[in-house]
Protein backbone atom coordinates (compact mmCIF):
# COMPACT_ATOMS: atom_id res chain seq x y z
CA UNK A 1 0.00 0.00 0.00
CA UNK A 2 1.52 3.37 -0.98
CA UNK A 3 2.30 5.77 1.82
CA UNK A 4 0.05 8.83 1.81
CA UNK A 5 0.75 12.28 3.17
CA UNK A 6 -0.40 13.02 6.70
CA UNK A 7 -0.40 16.77 7.27
CA UNK A 8 -0.70 16.67 11.07
CA UNK A 9 2.83 15.33 11.80
CA UNK A 10 4.25 17.64 9.12
CA UNK A 11 2.67 20.71 10.70
CA UNK A 12 3.55 19.51 14.21
CA UNK A 13 7.18 18.98 13.25
CA UNK A 14 7.35 22.38 11.56
CA UNK A 15 5.80 24.08 14.59
CA UNK A 16 8.32 22.34 16.83
CA UNK A 17 11.23 23.66 14.75
CA UNK A 18 9.83 27.19 14.81
CA UNK A 19 9.24 26.99 18.55
CA UNK A 20 12.77 25.75 19.18
CA UNK A 21 14.14 28.67 17.18
CA UNK A 22 12.04 31.13 19.14
CA UNK A 23 13.16 29.65 22.47
CA UNK A 24 16.79 30.03 21.41
CA UNK A 25 16.19 33.74 20.85
CA UNK A 26 14.37 34.07 24.17
CA UNK A 27 17.01 32.32 26.29
CA UNK A 28 19.90 33.89 24.39
CA UNK A 29 22.59 31.31 25.16
CA UNK A 30 25.05 29.63 22.77
CA UNK A 31 25.22 25.86 22.37
CA UNK A 32 28.00 24.43 24.55
CA UNK A 33 30.48 23.21 21.94
CA UNK A 34 33.64 24.55 20.34
CA UNK A 35 34.54 27.96 21.77
CA UNK A 36 31.74 27.68 24.30
CA UNK A 37 32.49 24.16 25.55
CA UNK A 38 33.92 25.57 28.80
CA UNK A 39 30.34 25.89 30.05
CA UNK A 40 29.91 22.09 29.99
CA UNK A 41 29.83 20.40 33.39
CA UNK A 42 33.06 18.57 34.23
CA UNK A 43 31.12 15.36 34.91
CA UNK A 44 29.67 15.09 31.40
CA UNK A 45 31.37 12.48 29.15
CA UNK A 46 33.12 13.82 26.06
CA UNK A 47 33.28 12.29 22.59
CA UNK A 48 36.04 12.85 20.01
CA UNK A 49 34.89 15.59 17.63
CA UNK A 50 35.27 13.53 14.45
CA UNK A 51 33.31 10.57 15.75
CA UNK A 52 30.61 12.77 17.27
CA UNK A 53 30.09 14.84 14.11
CA UNK A 54 29.98 11.73 11.93
CA UNK A 55 27.43 9.91 14.07
CA UNK A 56 25.18 12.88 14.75
CA UNK A 57 24.98 14.04 11.12
CA UNK A 58 24.60 10.53 9.66
CA UNK A 59 20.84 10.10 10.39
CA UNK A 60 19.80 13.03 8.17
CA UNK A 61 21.81 11.59 5.28
CA UNK A 62 20.56 8.02 5.76
CA UNK A 63 16.92 9.06 6.10
CA UNK A 64 16.89 11.32 3.04
CA UNK A 65 18.82 8.95 0.78
CA UNK A 66 16.82 5.98 2.07
CA UNK A 67 13.50 7.61 1.19
CA UNK A 68 14.79 8.54 -2.25
CA UNK A 69 16.04 5.02 -2.89
CA UNK A 70 12.87 3.23 -1.78
CA UNK A 71 10.34 5.26 -3.70
CA UNK A 72 9.29 3.94 -7.12
CA UNK A 73 9.82 7.24 -8.90
CA UNK A 74 12.81 8.35 -10.93
CA UNK A 75 15.58 9.75 -8.73
CA UNK A 76 16.01 12.94 -10.73
CA UNK A 77 12.48 13.36 -11.99
CA UNK A 78 10.02 15.25 -9.75
CA UNK A 79 11.24 18.54 -8.20
CA UNK A 80 10.73 17.09 -4.72
CA UNK A 81 13.35 14.45 -5.45
CA UNK A 82 15.85 17.01 -6.69
CA UNK A 83 15.26 19.21 -3.65
CA UNK A 84 15.71 16.26 -1.32
CA UNK A 85 18.88 15.51 -3.25
CA UNK A 86 20.19 18.96 -2.27
CA UNK A 87 19.35 18.21 1.36
CA UNK A 88 21.19 14.89 1.06
CA UNK A 89 24.21 16.59 -0.52
CA UNK A 90 24.59 18.90 2.46
CA UNK A 91 24.52 16.02 4.91
CA UNK A 92 26.81 13.90 2.75
CA UNK A 93 29.41 16.64 3.12
CA UNK A 94 28.73 17.03 6.83
CA UNK A 95 28.88 13.29 7.49
CA UNK A 96 31.69 12.05 5.29
CA UNK A 97 33.89 15.09 4.67
CA UNK A 98 33.50 17.74 7.36
CA UNK A 99 33.52 15.21 10.20
CA UNK A 100 36.78 13.67 8.98
CA UNK A 101 38.51 17.03 8.56
CA UNK A 102 37.37 18.86 11.67
CA UNK A 103 39.93 19.82 14.29
CA UNK A 104 37.36 20.94 16.81
CA UNK A 105 37.21 20.19 20.50
CA UNK A 106 35.52 17.05 21.85
CA UNK A 107 31.73 17.28 22.14
CA UNK A 108 29.83 16.58 25.32
CA UNK A 109 27.53 13.57 25.29
CA UNK A 110 24.57 15.87 25.99
CA UNK A 111 25.22 18.05 22.94
CA UNK A 112 25.83 14.94 20.84
CA UNK A 113 22.51 13.36 21.85
CA UNK A 114 20.61 16.59 21.23
CA UNK A 115 22.20 17.02 17.79
CA UNK A 116 21.52 13.39 16.88
CA UNK A 117 17.87 13.67 17.91
CA UNK A 118 17.54 16.86 15.88
CA UNK A 119 19.07 15.30 12.76
CA UNK A 120 16.77 12.29 13.03
CA UNK A 121 13.64 14.39 13.51
CA UNK A 122 14.45 17.06 10.94
CA UNK A 123 15.68 14.50 8.42
CA UNK A 124 12.41 12.60 8.70
CA UNK A 125 10.35 15.80 8.46
CA UNK A 126 12.07 17.21 5.37
CA UNK A 127 12.30 13.86 3.56
CA UNK A 128 8.74 12.78 4.37
CA UNK A 129 7.31 16.06 3.15
CA UNK A 130 9.25 16.14 -0.12
CA UNK A 131 8.61 12.49 -0.97
CA UNK A 132 5.00 12.06 0.13
CA UNK A 133 3.44 15.52 0.50
CA UNK A 134 5.05 17.97 -1.92
CA UNK A 135 3.16 18.70 -5.12
CA UNK A 136 4.89 20.87 -7.69
CA UNK A 137 3.66 21.93 -11.12
CA UNK A 138 5.55 20.72 -14.19
CA UNK A 139 6.99 24.20 -14.72
CA UNK A 140 8.51 24.39 -11.21
CA UNK A 141 12.01 23.97 -12.62
CA UNK A 142 11.58 27.28 -14.45
CA UNK A 143 9.93 29.05 -11.51
CA UNK A 144 11.98 31.92 -10.08
CA UNK A 145 11.59 30.56 -6.56
CA UNK A 146 13.25 27.30 -7.57
CA UNK A 147 16.01 28.93 -9.64
CA UNK A 148 16.91 31.63 -7.12
CA UNK A 149 16.57 29.21 -4.21
CA UNK A 150 18.93 26.64 -5.71
CA UNK A 151 21.39 29.42 -6.55
CA UNK A 152 21.47 30.62 -2.95
CA UNK A 153 21.66 27.05 -1.66
CA UNK A 154 24.78 26.39 -3.73
CA UNK A 155 26.22 29.82 -2.89
CA UNK A 156 25.65 29.33 0.82
CA UNK A 157 27.08 25.82 0.81
CA UNK A 158 30.16 27.12 -0.99
CA UNK A 159 30.62 29.92 1.55
CA UNK A 160 30.17 27.47 4.41
CA UNK A 161 32.69 24.96 3.07
CA UNK A 162 35.24 27.65 2.19
CA UNK A 163 34.91 29.32 5.60
CA UNK A 164 35.25 26.00 7.44
CA UNK A 165 38.40 25.31 5.44
CA UNK A 166 39.85 28.68 6.44
CA UNK A 167 39.09 27.99 10.10
CA UNK A 168 40.82 24.59 9.95
CA UNK A 169 43.94 26.20 8.52
CA UNK A 170 44.23 28.40 11.60
CA UNK A 171 44.94 25.41 13.82
CA UNK A 172 47.53 22.67 13.44
CA UNK A 173 46.55 19.08 14.37
CA UNK A 174 46.43 18.76 18.15
CA UNK A 175 46.34 22.50 18.83
CA UNK A 176 43.59 24.03 20.96
CA UNK A 177 44.59 27.68 20.63
CA UNK A 178 42.54 30.30 18.77
CA UNK A 179 43.67 32.74 16.11
CA UNK A 180 41.89 35.56 14.30
CA UNK A 181 40.41 34.30 11.01
CA UNK A 182 41.32 36.44 8.01
CA UNK A 183 40.15 36.61 4.41
CA UNK A 184 36.98 35.69 2.59
CA UNK A 185 33.80 36.73 4.36
CA UNK A 186 35.75 36.73 7.62
CA UNK A 187 36.92 40.16 6.50
CA UNK A 188 33.42 41.40 7.26
CA UNK A 189 31.90 39.01 9.82
CA UNK A 190 33.07 36.74 12.63
CA UNK A 191 30.60 33.99 11.72
CA UNK A 192 31.26 33.58 8.00
CA UNK A 193 30.71 29.82 8.20
CA UNK A 194 27.40 30.37 9.98
CA UNK A 195 26.31 32.99 7.46
CA UNK A 196 27.00 30.55 4.64
CA UNK A 197 24.84 27.83 6.17
CA UNK A 198 22.03 30.29 6.89
CA UNK A 199 22.06 31.42 3.25
CA UNK A 200 22.13 27.77 2.19
CA UNK A 201 18.99 26.78 4.10
CA UNK A 202 17.16 29.98 3.19
CA UNK A 203 17.81 29.08 -0.43
CA UNK A 204 16.52 25.58 0.23
CA UNK A 205 13.37 27.01 1.80
CA UNK A 206 12.79 29.30 -1.17
CA UNK A 207 13.31 26.51 -3.70
CA UNK A 208 11.14 24.11 -1.73
CA UNK A 209 8.49 26.69 -0.83
CA UNK A 210 7.20 24.56 2.02
CA UNK A 211 6.33 25.05 5.68
CA UNK A 212 8.88 22.44 6.93
CA UNK A 213 11.69 24.05 4.94
CA UNK A 214 10.88 27.57 6.13
CA UNK A 215 10.65 26.31 9.71
CA UNK A 216 14.08 24.69 9.33
CA UNK A 217 15.53 27.88 7.83
CA UNK A 218 14.10 29.91 10.71
CA UNK A 219 15.57 27.53 13.28
CA UNK A 220 18.94 27.68 11.51
CA UNK A 221 18.87 31.49 11.52
CA UNK A 222 18.10 31.57 15.25
CA UNK A 223 20.56 28.86 16.26
CA UNK A 224 23.53 29.86 14.12
CA UNK A 225 22.78 33.56 14.50
CA UNK A 226 23.10 33.14 18.27
CA UNK A 227 26.34 31.18 17.83
CA UNK A 228 27.73 33.92 15.59
CA UNK A 229 26.82 36.60 18.14
CA UNK A 230 28.67 34.81 20.94
CA UNK A 231 31.59 33.92 18.67
CA UNK A 232 31.96 37.63 17.94
CA UNK A 233 31.93 38.47 21.65
CA UNK A 234 34.49 35.72 22.25
CA UNK A 235 36.87 37.17 19.66
CA UNK A 236 36.46 40.74 20.94
CA UNK A 237 37.22 39.60 24.48
CA UNK A 238 40.18 37.38 23.58
CA UNK A 239 41.95 39.59 21.01
CA UNK A 240 42.64 43.25 21.77
CA UNK A 241 43.57 43.83 18.12
CA UNK A 242 40.40 42.23 16.72
CA UNK A 243 39.09 44.27 13.74
CA UNK A 244 36.58 46.77 15.12
CA UNK A 245 34.75 47.09 11.79
CA UNK A 246 33.98 43.38 11.65
CA UNK A 247 30.39 42.43 12.52
CA UNK A 248 29.01 39.21 13.98
CA UNK A 249 26.88 37.82 11.14
CA UNK A 250 25.63 40.39 8.60
CA UNK A 251 28.31 42.56 6.92
CA UNK A 252 28.17 46.23 7.99
CA UNK A 253 24.93 45.68 9.95
CA UNK A 254 25.06 43.09 12.76
Swiss-Prot record:
Reactions performed catalytically: a 3-oxo-5alpha-steroid + NADP(+) = a 3-oxo-Delta(4)-steroid + NADPH + H(+); 17beta-hydroxy-5alpha-androstan-3-one + NADP(+) = testosterone + NADPH + H(+); 5alpha-pregnane-3,20-dione + NADP(+) = progesterone + NADPH + H(+)
A GO cellular-component term linked to this record: neuronal cell body
Protein name: 3-oxo-5-alpha-steroid 4-dehydrogenase 2
Main localisation: membrane
Family statement: Belongs to the steroid 5-alpha reductase family.
Mode of membrane association: Multi-pass membrane protein
Gene: Srd5a2
PROSITE patterns: S5A_REDUCTASE (PS50244)
Residue ranges of the TM segments: 8-28, 72-92, 146-166, 206-226
Entry's Gene Ontology BP terms: androgen biosynthetic process; biphenyl metabolic process; bone development; cell differentiation; dibenzo-p-dioxin metabolic process; female genitalia development; hippocampus development; hypothalamus development
Higher taxonomy: Eukaryota, Metazoa, Chordata, Craniata, Vertebrata
Compartments it resides in: Microsome membrane; Endoplasmic reticulum membrane
